[in-house]
Amino acid sequence: MRGIVRNHGGGTVGQMTAMSLDRADSTPKSGASRGELWLVALLTLGALVLRLPFLGDHNADIDEQLYALIGSQMLQGQLPFVDLWDRKPFGLFLLFGLADASGLPAPWSYQLMATGFIVIGALLLRRLALLLVDRGTATVAALLYIVLMTIYGSHSAQTEAFHVPAMLAMALLVRDIRHPNALRRAWFAMLIGGLALQVKYTVFPQCVFFGLWALWGRYRAGRTLSQLVAIAAGFAALGLLPTIGVGLFYLAIGGWEEFWFANFVSFFLRAPAPMGRFADQYTIFVMPLVVLTVAGLY
């Protein structure tokens, strides 16, 4: 932030932020072709090298084995919740089904797909970092994203590999409430959030936060209360649209009870873990994140 203050010392914080966002948006378009290909190659290589010990290993993690089984059986006409049970959303199994349809053997198919999502997340994070730092530092942040995602459970094809990039995309779209197309970008962000919900429902709080931030922007833009209520309803409808669509599908085929129980009831019937939600060793495990957070605030 000190760099922003030096460049725009005469403006308010809001003006400085808006100017920095505009500067990031005005990155030369040619950089998205030749000039940025090296970046995609670098991040892809970094992701492959870091994840190499796990690629091709069926036992890299246990959850994906079930996701892959259900996804592959979807191609044979079987359905999640009705024929094969798990509490994860339909969209996650669809992703694994698409990976299986690629023709690559499991686990290569879904692990390489997850690697692609990791690279996309790194690119999105770099885009966010460019609002505050130079290109080199932003690239380091993108590489650090790949490292941390690998260390903290997304070394194979856990759900975070897929829905974290969606959250980063939402942040990019709604971050600038003064953007001339802020509302249009917010509509798109809410749809992305809805798709992320179909990967894992635990992204709901983040989606609500981004929706409220976008709504605050409309309030600052002078929208009336009735307009804000209508916009909020539209945000909610777009965010729930993918899940509603899946629910209507199961209702049409007579599988509504199975869908409802798996998605919205079974979670509350889970037995608590013996160690509790947070084990004692987690404190040490998250210390690197605390250090990075403090450094970032500085």
For each feature predicted by the language model, list its residue ranges.
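Membrane-interface transmembrane helices that cradle and orient dolichyl/undecaprenyl
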Residues: 136, 170-188, 215-222, 291-298
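Short acidic/glycine- and proline-prone juxtamembrane loop motifs at membrane-interface regions
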Residues: 155-163
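Membrane-interface alpha helices of multi-pass inner-membrane proteins
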Residues: 184-201, 207-213, 241
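Perimembrane helix-loop-helix junctions
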Residues: 206-240
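Transmembrane-lumen/periplasm boundary regions of multi-pass, lipid-linked membrane glycan transferases
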Residues: 228-298
